[in-house]
């Protein structure tokens, strides 16, 4: 057959789908170029050339740069390589299809090779298979059903032959238990076999029991012959695609030899010779074994020898494909580990994850980062050295030809210059380091491409790893500067999570104008000031900027004209250089003119009269005293009116990240991202200038305690230690009152821990009282720039209790924490309380305990990083292809609907101004009132306000708003109108007349213009908050849930209010939820009671639910031996039963013993009186009666007499939030249904934290709600807030198939169809072999597949399909209807 070479066509083609399948031996031969027969690699002569028909034959491609391929004549870069093949002397099992081979053998008759299904069953399954669009999952499920049906039959429906069990036996061996049968044998083959041994059995009886163990060995040759005989109509029932491969293709009879380019020979410099690839060496071994078997067969060697060689050949073929086989016999085990095909594909460094899904890139740089507050927040300083290496291909045109010529003249060594020129219509590049640059510059033509250096103003991508969320890579504008580090504004540290202690960052230069535009608009720093997790600002002032702004805005900061002008002048840089700064009138005129720091700060928001910004904000600061608003004595109520700071000092809440009451956030939402970024850049220049001129430092003097503080500390310690001694004494004398659900020891620990934490808190308070307002650590803690009050008190007063796993330091050995203390000591010092401060220094024992707590923190962090990294990878893989469509639904790449509208309202979490809400109406209204005072307009009365708002909302512009949003606005306006009415009533103003005109202008007035502007603003903001079609909502959801995980802890926490009840929180809890674990570590059912204010009723219900064992309510359980009888006597403790409020008596105990698994009949249990139960065991042999009694005595205390067996305990929880005590039960354990059905429990208000349990009891919707609530509860406990829309999307994905699917390799396989996607996640080889077996077709539509194939994905920009505008034809004239009469036409009323 003549083979035509592949020719690259000019027609651009897109891969529409990939079909997986198996190659038949004939296809392998057609695809290959040579048959490989020689085991030698090189010829033995002096040339040392690769041998023809050897494994390194150059007709299979080339692995050397200077040698062309002998088949196609191309060089190493262009030749894709060509295959060879080896004919195996004996067939071998393919290790990848070994499970599939066993599966088929279990489904077919080993005599007639037909599938073991009756004609009706066959028809039924074939009808099902004919359904169009049968999914991969359905195929796998069907194969399982067919296999189960076939395995249940042991007689073939067609030939009547007996079929035993087929199973794997040892390494790549299959046996058929053909003769193992207990029934009367009907099969003549088996009968003949057994009869042939009759004579032998007569002579040797020992042979008989061994006959049943006789097995048929199914070697590859036998299996191949069986598979070849399978009828063509049965192949679809094996769930194989006949076009993609037949069952006989599962057995190797011919082996493909891969091209040389994927297994290159490396010439060794150290010793003469070459280093060969693992695959090459494995192939030579296979050829050698092939030759050995061939010789043995020709020479007629012993079968034993041929079988051994065959086994070894089979092993080598298996290792060639997968070198990590387990169970290899020692005598056959390879000497050194090699890499097979599977190893090349799988794992992080494999082809899928290492080279296809992600790869190293050109046009990138990496170096150390440094801060530079003089740069704008959207800029990055790039070293000249980097700028000379990174190039951008710019097309020469009329506008830039002179500039390009200048760059060409400069060449590669002078910046700005150019490195290469590519002339129009040629592929050749000319390097500018050599040659006549002047001549090249003159010869430049339009359309030529100059690869110029990176210059100021270029768009670059800046990234820091680990990239946990989308803000870890953003677009900046380059500024080429001297020195060797990347520099950027510190405001942008938070999204990158960068610090300057040696961190390195990556820089990428986009290579097309389209990429630059897309990067700036979508990834620009200004476009990403807020986090998509919950819409909070992430790029904001930090550390020194906060300290500077705080000190600048204190109420006692004043400047003369020169100083004020000097500080304000620091903002006149870059695009603000030419603005005319408006200096406000001085706040103090006499005795000297002085400007306040607040006035200077206001110039950041509105530097000149030309600036249109009118920002308005009213919010509480960190130190707000709680009353008086702007009259707060700490000056911590911030009021900004039309961009003027009226009151309050700046702190982290008003300038920093993580708060929506932030000045920059207000600017962003009301005036746009450019104004917010400009204000931030101005602050970043002004605050450090002021701080460096004022001076701000920290030294040992700042943390030196005074005498008064030391005295107060010792008094506190003395009182606290005394109280702890009293608790310990109470425990020793047995007077300590136990807390609910706790032992005496646990109660003591809880009390002492509480007492010691009070000591530290009080010492901290005393410390803060003594510190001066100018104390540097105190200033940093007050403004939130660094540290907290606890850090200050630890430095000055007292370090406090060291906690290990949430409790005091445990006893290490010999019942004490260290040998320096007495045994069983409970003293604070012995259990890790550090009374010293860092200033005074720690004693050796304190230091040791302190290091224990520190070590725990380090280990926790290290473990957590790995856990969350893997969790985030799983989340991203499962959610990545979810995308909001143009019909507002959220669908996967295959078109499955996950949500009918994103988050229930179609709004973008990044655009939320309130908590999970698109708008904060009160703030919007206050802003409108300040910006549009409308003093000449009359105010609206209550009724006018409501009626006017309703008439405005009936306009067409409001039709696009959802009803729920319009209802929210109406509700807010109604509240405002009620407030106006109350104010008017208070001052006696009626709607008609006025008492005093001036009063009307001051009170809560709203004019028609203000109302209209308010409603317009609400509508605009709502429309802007809509989620854009094409948004990768899945990826955002995965990052928003995965990224906070890194800030969580791994430990379990005490359940709120109950010291003894632990609950898993943090990373392990999130992991449990998204894995959809069936058995969680701390299942807790929260049960509301019918009477929630009665403690006795709560105890009664607790007794009904909690598992009570017979041993717990018995005074004793004894054996009684009488001359004629023996039994076990159980004496119940009636007092204990009464105190525990149990509904138990002797009769119920008798019933419980009978229904337990002790095999005791009702007649064997006798009740005597109220409290005595006798259990008489059944007689069997008298000798074992004693043992029967002993086992009964051991098992009886474990009999459950009341309660739910799955419940380990229930705790009464007292809720005092509403002012009066409310009781509910916290039940540890499962069986939600039984708890809900318990008398006294409100079933409709009972919930569990176990998703699986909820799904089993209440169904899939309840399970979905549980997932949402549990993730939110866990996040809130760690101080994280995630927009509910993200959590809803995750829970919808986990439950949309009708069962709860975990985000694991098993859940993912049930959610996704794509082979490439599953292969790029985990179990790479298994998925590929399965796909080949089923003949699977991958339509390449998801994100992973598109990245692997290098084609644009249908998400974001790729979702939109540009349609051709058809020529508009005139509509044909309307034809009159039969019997039509114009007189009867009814006009359409509009």
Curated annotation (Swiss-Prot):
<dbReference type="InterPro" id="IPR000722">
    <property type="entry name" value="RNA_pol_asu"/>
</dbReference>
<dbReference type="InterPro" id="IPR044893">
    <property type="entry name" value="RNA_pol_Rpb1_clamp_domain"/>
</dbReference>
<comment type="function">
    <text>DNA-dependent RNA polymerase catalyzes the transcription of DNA into RNA using the four ribonucleoside triphosphates as substrates. Largest and catalytic core component of RNA polymerase III which synthesizes small RNAs, such as 5S rRNA and tRNAs. Forms the polymerase active center together with the second largest subunit. A single-stranded DNA template strand of the promoter is positioned within the central active site cleft of Pol III.</text>
</comment>
<dbReference type="GO" id="GO:0005666">
    <property type="term" value="C:RNA polymerase III complex"/>
</dbReference>
<feature type="binding site">
    <location>
        <position position="503"/>
    </location>
    <ligand>
        <name>Mg(2+)</name>
    </ligand>
</feature>
<feature type="binding site">
    <location>
        <position position="69"/>
    </location>
    <ligand>
        <name>Zn(2+) 1</name>
    </ligand>
</feature>
<dbReference type="InterPro" id="IPR035698">
    <property type="entry name" value="RNAP_III_Rpc1_C"/>
</dbReference>
<dbReference type="GO" id="GO:0005739">
    <property type="term" value="C:mitochondrion"/>
</dbReference>
<dbReference type="Pfam" id="PF04983">
    <property type="entry name" value="RNA_pol_Rpb1_3"/>
</dbReference>
<keyword id="KW-0804">Transcription</keyword>
<feature type="binding site">
    <location>
        <position position="109"/>
    </location>
    <ligand>
        <name>Zn(2+) 2</name>
    </ligand>
</feature>
<dbReference type="InterPro" id="IPR007083">
    <property type="entry name" value="RNA_pol_Rpb1_4"/>
</dbReference>
<dbReference type="InterPro" id="IPR007080">
    <property type="entry name" value="RNA_pol_Rpb1_1"/>
</dbReference>
<protein>
    <recommendedName>
        <fullName>DNA-directed RNA polymerase III subunit RPC1</fullName>
        <ecNumber>2.7.7.6</ecNumber>
    </recommendedName>
</protein>
<comment type="subunit">
    <text>Component of the RNA polymerase III (Pol III) complex consisting of 17 subunits.</text>
</comment>
<dbReference type="GO" id="GO:0046872">
    <property type="term" value="F:metal ion binding"/>
</dbReference>
<keyword id="KW-0808">Transferase</keyword>
<feature type="binding site">
    <location>
        <position position="72"/>
    </location>
    <ligand>
        <name>Zn(2+) 1</name>
    </ligand>
</feature>
<keyword id="KW-0460">Magnesium</keyword>
<dbReference type="GO" id="GO:0031981">
    <property type="term" value="C:nuclear lumen"/>
</dbReference>
<comment type="similarity">
    <text>Belongs to the RNA polymerase beta' chain family.</text>
</comment>
<feature type="region of interest" description="Bridging helix">
    <location>
        <begin position="844"/>
        <end position="856"/>
    </location>
</feature>
<dbReference type="InterPro" id="IPR038120">
    <property type="entry name" value="Rpb1_funnel_sf"/>
</dbReference>
<feature type="binding site">
    <location>
        <position position="79"/>
    </location>
    <ligand>
        <name>Zn(2+) 1</name>
    </ligand>
</feature>
<keyword id="KW-0479">Metal-binding</keyword>
<dbReference type="InterPro" id="IPR007081">
    <property type="entry name" value="RNA_pol_Rpb1_5"/>
</dbReference>
<dbReference type="GO" id="GO:0003899">
    <property type="term" value="F:DNA-directed RNA polymerase activity"/>
</dbReference>
<feature type="binding site">
    <location>
        <position position="499"/>
    </location>
    <ligand>
        <name>Mg(2+)</name>
    </ligand>
</feature>
<dbReference type="InterPro" id="IPR015700">
    <property type="entry name" value="RPC1"/>
</dbReference>
<dbReference type="Pfam" id="PF00623">
    <property type="entry name" value="RNA_pol_Rpb1_2"/>
</dbReference>
<dbReference type="InterPro" id="IPR007066">
    <property type="entry name" value="RNA_pol_Rpb1_3"/>
</dbReference>
<dbReference type="GO" id="GO:0003677">
    <property type="term" value="F:DNA binding"/>
</dbReference>
<keyword id="KW-0539">Nucleus</keyword>
<dbReference type="InterPro" id="IPR042102">
    <property type="entry name" value="RNA_pol_Rpb1_3_sf"/>
</dbReference>
<dbReference type="Pfam" id="PF04998">
    <property type="entry name" value="RNA_pol_Rpb1_5"/>
</dbReference>
<feature type="binding site">
    <location>
        <position position="112"/>
    </location>
    <ligand>
        <name>Zn(2+) 2</name>
    </ligand>
</feature>
<feature type="binding site">
    <location>
        <position position="82"/>
    </location>
    <ligand>
        <name>Zn(2+) 1</name>
    </ligand>
</feature>
<dbReference type="InterPro" id="IPR006592">
    <property type="entry name" value="RNA_pol_N"/>
</dbReference>
<feature type="binding site">
    <location>
        <position position="156"/>
    </location>
    <ligand>
        <name>Zn(2+) 2</name>
    </ligand>
</feature>
<dbReference type="InterPro" id="IPR035697">
    <property type="entry name" value="RNAP_III_RPC1_N"/>
</dbReference>
<keyword id="KW-0862">Zinc</keyword>
<dbReference type="Pfam" id="PF05000">
    <property type="entry name" value="RNA_pol_Rpb1_4"/>
</dbReference>
